[in-house]
């Protein structure tokens, strides 16, 4: 009998999904039935379409373990065969190395893509009715929020308040958790400043170096592709491996193809948001680094979104939504791999997370607009400009507060000279 691998048997275990297992105690997902359509399978598709049942299943993009409970007048296995066949007939394929992936442009996905094109393809000013002078404040706050949330997904346990104060005041990180958050903040700033540059293996390694700085057991692994296969994604409840990344020898070719995918248009048009989701997933799938793959994947997602002209991405904290729905985030990865690398599960999840992030941004802006209006009252004082008014408002709200020059620099992203 083959001995089960336990957590202690793995020299290095990636935190990309491991922390999600520790926190949520997920069990292994159920494997779907083998795809084996018959003549009856084809005959079943038409009535399912006419009833609108199939469209609903597609828009939610149900996995086998969810779909089987929807069967009414047919056996669950037969329903799965029909749904799977319909997906196969409408799929688009992608190839990375020896691995083939697919995705389906469901009605929901197409509607979401159109909505994002309408709302996040411009600027904060044009889309949200915010004065140009205020956009900088929202960007700084959003970078901080994204940095904190992306680190917390991977297990950073510092509170949001403490982490925000650390970044704004420019104090040195005092723990690994704080270092992770500071690293993410520096990475986000780097991406915003270099968003138009191409992705290369070297630039991906540099992103990882920024993300992993002083957080790995082996410092030499910062910014270095792994050269070993001691990387596993493990289900904590039973210590079973749920994902084994490609062999380390495959990494150069896979990353090279991923960079080409990032930098150039494919022969068949792929919507930029779909490409961003694929890039996010593929970094997690390849696991090119010993650790920090999740943070790197989310950073590359943001980079591609900004490169593609979706400027409002700078103001969205998608990782905060992912942190709140990390069980679904993990399952989106697992469903994709378990169901013949069907990326539609992950794309659907990611677009829904973006929708929630956009709604959260609108709520945040409405609240901040009221604060900005209150701060603007101080501008009636002779010689007080917008930035000064904000500082006065902070002190007015908290008379005990002491603002250092460093905190003003970080809060407003300005030089030391201007802060003084």
Language-model segments: which ranges?
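FIC/Doc superfamily catalytic core
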Residues: 2-291, 295-420
């Amino acid at each position: 009998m083959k001995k089960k691998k336990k957590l202690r048997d793995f020299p290095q275990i990636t935190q990309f999904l491991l922390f999600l297992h520790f926190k949520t105690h997920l069990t292994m997902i159920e494997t779907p039935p083998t795809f084996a359509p018959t003549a009856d399978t084809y005959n079943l598709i038409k009535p399912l379409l006419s009833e609108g049942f199939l469209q609903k299943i597609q828009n939610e993009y149900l996995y086998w373990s969810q779909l089987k409970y929807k069967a009414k007048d047919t056996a669950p296995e037969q329903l799965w065969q029909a749904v799977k066949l319909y997906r196969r007939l409408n799929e688009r394929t992608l190839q990375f190395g020896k691995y083939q992936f697919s995705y389906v442009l469901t009605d929901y996905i197409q509607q979401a893509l159109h909505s994002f094109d309408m709302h996040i393809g411009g600027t904060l000013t044009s889309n949200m009715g915010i004065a140009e002078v205020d956009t900088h404040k929202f960007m700084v706050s959003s970078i901080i929020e994204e940095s904190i949330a992306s680190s917390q997904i991977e297990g950073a346990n510092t509170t949001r308040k403490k982490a925000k104060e650390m970044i704004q005041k420019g104090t040195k990180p005092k723990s690994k958790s704080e270092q992770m958050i500071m690293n993410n903040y520096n990475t986000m700033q780097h991406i915003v400043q270099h968003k138009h540059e191409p992705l290369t293996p070297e630039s991906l390694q540099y992103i990882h170096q920024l993300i992993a700085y002083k957080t790995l057991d082996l410092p030499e692994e910062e910014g270095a592709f792994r050269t070993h296969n001691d990387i596993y994604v493990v289900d904590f409840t039973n210590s079973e491996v749920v994902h084994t990344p490609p062999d380390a020898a495959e990494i150069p070719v896979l990353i090279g193809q991923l960079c080409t995918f990032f930098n150039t248009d494919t022969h068949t048009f792929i919507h930029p948001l779909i490409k961003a989701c694929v890039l996010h997933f593929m970094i997690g799938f390849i696991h090119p680094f010993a650790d920090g793959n999740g943070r790197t994947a989310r950073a590359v997602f943001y980079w591609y979104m900004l490169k593609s002209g979706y400027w409002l991405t700078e103001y969205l904290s998608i990782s905060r939504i992912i942190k709140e729905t990390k069980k679904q985030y993990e399952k989106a990865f697992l469903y994709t791999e378990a169901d013949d690398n069907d990326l539609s599960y992950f794309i659907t999840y990611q677009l829904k997370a973006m929708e929630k992030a956009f709604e959260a941004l609108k709520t945040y802006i409405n609240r901040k607009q009221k604060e900005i209006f209150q701060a603007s009252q101080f501008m009636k004082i002779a010689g007080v400009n917008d930035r000064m008014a904000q500082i006065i408002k902070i002190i007015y709200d908290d008379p005990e507060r002491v603002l250092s020059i460093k905190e003003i620099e970080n809060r407003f992203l300005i030089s030391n000279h201007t802060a003084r």
